[in-house]
A protein has these predicted regions:
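Repeated scaffold domains used in trafficking and secretory/extracellular systems
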Residues: 68-72
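Intrinsically disordered or low-complexity boundary/linker segments at protein termini
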Residues: 1-67, 78-82, 88-94, 102-171
Length: 171
C-alpha cells in the first residue's frame, strides 16, 4: 500500500499533476492501493484526476485537516507500506510551518516504514487555470483563491508577454 499525505492547497502548485501522475503510475504498475490523506478541498482535485485518468488504480481517501494527524497514521503502517509525504518549500502556497518538524516526526514514529519525501516542482510553466472533470461530467475550473495566487497569476501573464520599453515621444 502507498499512503500519501498531501498538504492543503497543493493543487495550486506547479508540479501537482506531475507527482500525482507518477504516483498513480507506480500504483498501477505494482498493483497496490493508494490511500490519500488530505484536506477536503484538495481531495476533490485528486479524486477528479484519478477518476479521469487512472480508473483502474485502487484508491482510498481520508480527510486530514491538520498535520498533527500524521502521528496517528504510524499505528496502521506495516513494513510493506510506503509513506509518501508531499511537502512544499517556504514561501509557497501549500507550505506550513508544521512541515519543519517532519524529520523529527518521521524518524520517531515511522522507523520501520519506507518513506518518500516529495518536493514537487514549484517553478516552470503552470497552467493558468486548473480544469478537471467532475464525476457528473461537467468541467470544473478553479482560479486562485488567495490574493497571493492572483498576484502570481498576473505576474506570470506579464512575464509571458513581450513588453518593450520606449522613450517618451518615440515609437
Amino acid at each position: 500500500q502507498i499512503v500519501v499525505v498531501v498538504p492543503e492547497k497543493a493543487e495550486y502548485e506547479v508540479g501537482f499533476y506531475k507527482w500525482l501522475e507518477h504516483l498513480a503510475r507506480m500504483g498501477e504498475q505494482i498493483d497496490c492501493r493508494i490511500t490519500f490523506h488530505t484536506h477536503p478541498a484538495t481531495m476533490k482535485y485528486i479524486k477528479g484526476y484519478m477518476a479521469q485518468k487512472h480508473t483502474n488504480v485502487r484508491t482510498n481517501f481520508v480527510e486530514m485537516n491538520k498535520w498533527s494527524g500524521i502521528r496517528q497514521m504510524a499505528v496502521g503502517m506495516n513494513e510493506d507500506h510506503m509513506l509518501v509525504v508531499v511537502t512544499a518549500r517556504p514561501g509557497f502556497i501549500s507550505y506550513s510551518r508544521a512541515m519543519d518538524r517532519f524529520p523529527q516526526i518521521l524518524s520517531r514514529h515511522f522507523k520501520q516504514t519506507n518513506i518518500m519525501l516529495l518536493y514537487p516542482d514549484q517553478w516552470g510553466d503552470p497552467m493558468e487555470e486548473l480544469t478537471i472533470f467532475a464525476p457528473n461530467g461537467r468541467a470544473v475550473t478553479v482560479q486562485p483563491k488567495s490574493f497571493g495566487g492572483w498576484i502570481r497569476l498576473g505576474w506570470r501573464k506579464l512575464l509571458s508577454r513581450k513588453y518593450t520599453l520606449t522613450k517618451k515621444g518615440k515609437k
